Amino acid sequence: MANSNTNQLHPLGATTSQTFTTALNHTAASTIAINFRELIKEPKELDEASNYLYQALLDDVVAGIFIETHHLRKTGNLAALDGVGEENLESAFHICEMPNLDIFGISTAKKQMDCTCPNCDRLVAAARFAPHLEKCMGMGRISSRIASRRLATKEGSSASTSSTSTYLQSGGNTGGTDDEDDVDWSSDKRKKKSTQSSRNNGSKKNNGKTF
C-alpha cells in the first residue's frame, strides 16, 4: 500500500516546478488530503506533499496579485492604490485657513443665482424673480389695476373711434354738408340770444313799475 502511494505521489513531488492546470491542482490537493494519515507514516512522502502544497499556494497567491494589478493598471486605478508619495505628502494634506474658504480652499460664499423671465427674457435675481414676474405679467394688485385701466382706456378709445366712424357714415348718407351744419348752428345760436335778450328786457320793465 505504501509503495502504491509512493508511486502516486512521486510524480506530483517531482513535477512541483512545472505548471499544472487548475483541475490537476485540485485533484492533487484532494488526494493528499485523503491520504494524509498514510503520508504521516513516511517522512519522505510527507516532505514532498508539503512542498507541493506550498508551491500550489504560492502560485495561487502570485497569480491573484498579478491579475489584480493588471486589472488596476487597465482601469487606471493603480495610481489611487499607490497613494501619495512622501515628497508630496505635506502639500497633499495642506489645510487652507483663508477667510471665505473651507479647509480644501473652495469658496463658501453663496453665489447669486439669476433666473430668466419667461415674459421679457431678462435676467433677474432669484430673490426678486417672483415680484418681477407679477409686475411683468400684470398679476399683482397694483399691476392688475394698471392693466385694468389700460384695458378700459383701450376699450374707450375703440368705442370713440367706432362712434366717430358711424357718425361720418350717417352724415354722408343724409347728404348734408359741413356748410349747412354751420348755418343751422349759427341760426340756432341767434334764436337763443334773441329769447334771452327779450326775457332780460321784460324783467327790467317789471322791476321799474310801481304798484
Curated annotation (Swiss-Prot):
Keywords: Activator, Chromatin regulator, Cytoplasm, Metal-binding, mRNA transport, Nucleus, Phosphoprotein, Protein transport, Transcription, Transcription regulation, Translocation, Transport, Zinc, Zinc-finger. GO terms for molecular function: transcription coactivator activity; zinc ion binding. Gene3D superfamilies: Classic Zinc Finger. InterPro entries: SAGA_su_Sgf11 (IPR013246), SGF11 (IPR051078). The keyword Hydrolase does not apply. One of its GO terms (biological process) is protein transport. The keyword Cytoplasm applies. Residues 157-166, 197-211 have a biased composition (Low complexity). The modification Phosphoserine is found at S187. Residues 149-211 are annotated as: Disordered. It is found in: Nucleus, Nucleoplasm; Cytoplasm. Pfam families: Sgf11. A zinc finger (SGF11-type) spans 115-136. GO terms for cellular component: cytoplasm; DUBm complex; nuclear pore; nucleoplasm; SAGA complex. The long N-terminal helix forms part of the 'assembly lobe' of the SAGA deubiquitination module. The C-terminal SGF11-type zinc-finger domain together with the C-terminal catalytic domain of not/nonstop forms the 'catalytic lobe' of the SAGA deubiquitination module. Component of the transcription regulatory histone acetylation (HAT) complex SAGA, a multiprotein complex that activates transcription by remodeling chromatin and mediating histone acetylation and deubiquitination. Within the SAGA complex, participates in a subcomplex that specifically deubiquitinates histone H2B. The SAGA complex is recruited to specific gene promoters by activators, where it is required for transcription. Required for nuclear receptor-mediated transactivation. Binds independently on SAGA to promoters in an RNA-dependent manner. Component of some SAGA transcription coactivator-HAT complexes, at least composed of Ada2b, not/nonstop, Pcaf/Gcn5, Sgf11 and Spt3. Within the SAGA complex, Sgf11, e(y)2, and not/nonstop form an additional subcomplex of SAGA called the DUB module (deubiquitination module). Interacts directly with not/nonstop. Interacts with the AMEX complex component xmas-2. Interacts with Cbp80; important for promoter recruitment of Sgf11 that is not associated with the DUB module. Belongs to the SGF11 family. This is SAGA-associated factor 11 homolog 1. The gene is Sgf11-1.
